[in-house]
Amino acid sequence: MKRIILLAITVAAMGMTADALTGDVNGDGTVNISDVNSVINTILTDGTSVAADVNSDGTVNIGDVNMLIEIILSGGADDDITPKEIALDDSELDEPAEVIPDDEDDLDYGDYVENTVWSTTVHIAFDGETATVTGNPSTVNVAIDGAHVTITTTTKRVRYVVTGTTTNGSLKFYSEKKFQLQLDGVDITNPTGAAVNNQCGKSFYLVINEGTVNTLRDGDNYTMVEDEDQKAALFSEGQILVSGKGKLNIYSTGKNCIASDDYVFVRPGCHLYLNSTSGHGIKAKDYVHIKGGVINMEIAADGAKGINCDSLVYITGGRTTIITSGTTLIETDGEGNPTTTGCAGVKADDNMTMTGGTLNIKCSGNDAKGINVAQPLLFSGGELNVVCTGKQKSIAPKGVKCDTDCTIQGGTFYSCAPKGRALDVDGTLTIADGYTTLNDADPRLLEISF
């Protein structure tokens, strides 16, 4: 409580007057230190007050004191800030011609499906409760149970082309070699697990054929197999390398939309729509690289992220729009202690770098962060728009949160958190010279243009 009073003293000389402002606890038309004192008195006496519940989370606690101080220091309540509108956008994107690396010594050479000669083509056709596989040589073993297809092979350079519709089917691959999966107008729903499950740790080239619309759905309850992962409607033990000029819609009600135990690479041209009520949009262990394409995500699960990576996140092109609506996930650990996990548009446990493209993020749930980065954040190009409209319930909402250093040196950077802070950097914040716009007078809004 001493800390609360000390914080209150620091803002004692500051205040503002407005009609019907959030934070006017005592109803005198002014938001100032007396309102902070009113909230503190309510807490000390275990009282109740609708007006003292400044962040509207149903309780009167330290969160309301903190929000009042933020309001006074910033000179206004959230009522006086109108954030940018952020909405899903599946319109065509004019992207520059992609340069395919042709030098085998290039580190990215193997990420491009064009750099492999595919010698075998296998066709998989779904039809309701059944599936048919044709063109497979004897070295590509096929097991079919209804419309659940399992491929087991050691054959190199196999291309699988999949078509048709099933509401109770799946594709599973056991392979020792990299392979290509072409989606050529397919709709797969697996009520008991992943729609596509790749148990191969090698490169998994996912090609979305031009002019096609494809859909993958998982189910609420996964039937787990011992010693096997299936963490998403589209899961791979190896890298997921997405290309093509078609559309892929993924709906997840059981786990994540896309998950890789390696990395995820999305190339220009494709259109992805990811909708999850149970987990993340994209989950990866190694890194996530968005080089291009149009990606739209709607993530509703508590504690979930649009992009969640155990390591690095790179945004170098395309247009990615992430909308989250979940709030904080509260669980208990093995000792019965509560743990909290907040929502975020992008969560990187290592560095995040953005050099191009457009990244739009809107988080409407309480406690959410637009971008949450554990290691240095570098923004050197492209367009970033982050809006977090949620309130503080157990974790402070932030537009962009960086646990170490943050460097902004190019592009257009916009972050707005009407009930929190636009940018929170625990290390050193560096804004390079040469900007044409710098709007940082209010801690809830930050705009920088170069």
Where are these regions (language model features)?
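Alpha-helical segments with a strong preference for the paired helices of cellulosomal dockerin domains
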Residues: V25-T48, D57-I81
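A composition-driven surface/loop motif
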Residues: D80-F450
